[in-house]
Amino acid sequence: MSDKNNDLKALRHSAEHVMHQAVKELFPAVQLAMGPATDEGFYNDFDSSPEGTDPVLVTEADFVKIEKRMQELIKLDLPITRHELSEAEAYKLFADNPYKLEWVDEISKKGEKITVYWTGKPGEKNSMADLCRGPHVESTGKIKAFKLLSLAGAYWHGDEKNKMLTRIYGTAFFSQKELDDYLHLMEEAKKRDHKKLGQALDLFTFSDLV
């Protein structure tokens, strides 16, 4: 993978951290599960109906306020820093989140280092930590252009025997032009797919008998 692709993955991973922080701040009852960078952008899975709480309805209509909070966090140019924790420290930090504790157990069993990335200064206002291997950009201010794209359901660990979580997809780029170009390409691809589907279903041809 080229340096630029690595840099883009780090940027998108950081955008995902900003997104899940915004989601958690706006919907405090949700439990964050996991969220990687991908070839196309990033996503985050979260539990919107944790045991013992009333379900929280998060829809694409909420993207406007989530993106607004993300912009605020980006404008603050918060540092994103890596920290190594002991198993006990990780258990204390994520005591109220069974998904994170499951990850801590898995990491510990493998004998790997437990690392978290803090957005903002640990423990201060506008800060949040998440289990993560990284890498990330140095601060939220490096995120120049992003967009939340869609919402879907996803089973925990991709196993239908597990609980269905809520997944938000998004993407990020180094510039607004790159983001705009990407969104344009996606829109054109969607139109082509719609046209193909229409032709397959014969939606765009009409019988003289009708």
Identify the residue ranges that each predicted region occupies.
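Structural signature of FAD isoalloxazine-binding scaffolds in flavoprotein oxidoreductases
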Residues: 36-38
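Active/ligand-binding-proximal structured segments within catalytic/core domains
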Residues: 8-27
